[in-house]
């Protein structure tokens, strides 16, 4: 081949590479002002003048540049949840690890590759400010062919093409929980009263919702069957907001050496429901498009709630979790933890009408309903139609629901294996780390490592990306794990074993920088010398052939005091400082986080000058 021909091929290749991997620039202006997304006014965060934050849509491998202007009177950062930030750890958006907080009046430019493809989201990561409304959806459209994914739903060529088109242009549902109090006010209620408070006012969909007050008797009847008998003292009643009494030992744990002051909980926090009629989100769908298929990308931007998603009279195919494609399965409802993202495919094969989307809090924290509407295009009737699968509080309305619903908390109920197949290395990992989760010292103090509490301002002035050895020979080194590049790592999480925390609610565990396989789940105290030994002794508690692959996982609900453990495996190929934490904002604020310095032997050395600290 001549020199000219080789040069021409290089130019052509460069052209097509650049044509695909275009540069996309975004601007996000963060402000603080009054709003009333559920009909009741409070101050909150707006992004570019809107709430929730704008949906961002890119193509896989786009070069993304996002300039964030902090026009509030408080610090902020933005985390790109689900994006792996390969070779760009300085753009992860975690204060104290990848950057200093963006101070009032300042800006920060995040630069990264749009990867991996799929459904993700972005949100604030400064203290508890997720409660205040900085969150929005991200959709990264893939380069690859997904015929093998859609052909598991339908063999019809027209359907396959239609589903690809529907997934390329989905509907977005950003689901969040909402309180009448700002994040700072909410946290102060717990620390002042000495009680962990987690009572909410609304479930919002795309920033819209209402405050419902159906009455205490109705809410009591909506409790999950057996919950009070199994978990709480006989005769326990919820309030007129659907909340359990704040001073229950089963809720607060302990005993703790602190003074409890329930009288310092303001009115209307736990009880005293005040209804407000506002509006719910409406999703208009067109059965004449895409052969009647519609895709929905759902973001669980909740701060406390565990939600359940369903659409009256419509089944759906769950085909993506946490931006990772899974072998599709058909359900009528699906449980989502705070921080997760789901993508579902729905066939619009019902009579044109208005169908209620039911999205209640399904956790044991509160009986709370949430709603939106899916409306067939052209429907003129204001009356709602369809068969409900869930009640106001998330209970199944027929026996079929339990058989056709997604429950993510155990290996034997979670069969959402990756597509295409992707499994971890069998046998032992190269490194194992046991993390004991729970409360220490107070009902609102949470640890990921037996006793260490992750401070809200941990390393804010000296982020670990730039000072990876800053915690050595200090007590704060208990907040840091270090791994080697190219190693397989097992994270073993133990719950319900710390003194005062034998009754444990779920934790929604999210790792930055990489996804993990959940390869094991079991009861009891972890007392094995290695994961390999546990696999030999308890093979039914492990799955290394088709384990799920995600960035957010739920631990077991153990209000009865039984201990549980989970094992998560991942491969280290993305050196940098990555936060591993509970996505319940109250738990993270209380200390439930740990910094994992992945690949310390291949630490990023060539940090761009624009990110160097002054």
From Swiss-Prot:
Q: Does the keyword Glycosyltransferase apply?
A: no
- Localization annotation: Cell surface
- What Pfam families does the database record attribute to this sequence? Cu-oxidase, Cu-oxidase_2, Cu-oxidase_3
Q: Which domain of life is it from?
A: Eukaryota
Query: Which keywords label this protein?
Result: Copper, Glycoprotein, Metal-binding, Oxidoreductase, Repeat, Signal
Cleaved signal peptide residues:
1-21
Cofactor(s) essential for the protein: Cu cation
Cellular component (GO) terms are: cell surface
Annotated residues that bind Cu cation 1 are located at: 79, 510
Sites where the protein binds Cu cation 2:
81, 123, 583
Residues modified by glycosylation: 75, 257, 280, 445, 469, 485, 527
Q: What does this protein do?
A: Laccase; part of the Pks1 gene cluster that mediates the biosynthesis of an anthraquinone derivative pigment that contributes to conidial pigmentation that provides protection from UV radiation, heat and cold stress. The polyketide synthase Pks1 produces 1-acetyl-2,4,6,8-tetrahydroxy-9,10-anthraquinone though condensation of acetyl-CoA with malonyl-CoA. The dehydratase EthD and the laccase Mlac1 further convert the anthraquinone derivative into the final conidial pigment.
Q: What protein am I looking at?
A: Laccase 1
Give the species: Metarhizium majus (strain ARSEF 297)
Give the gene name.
Mlac1
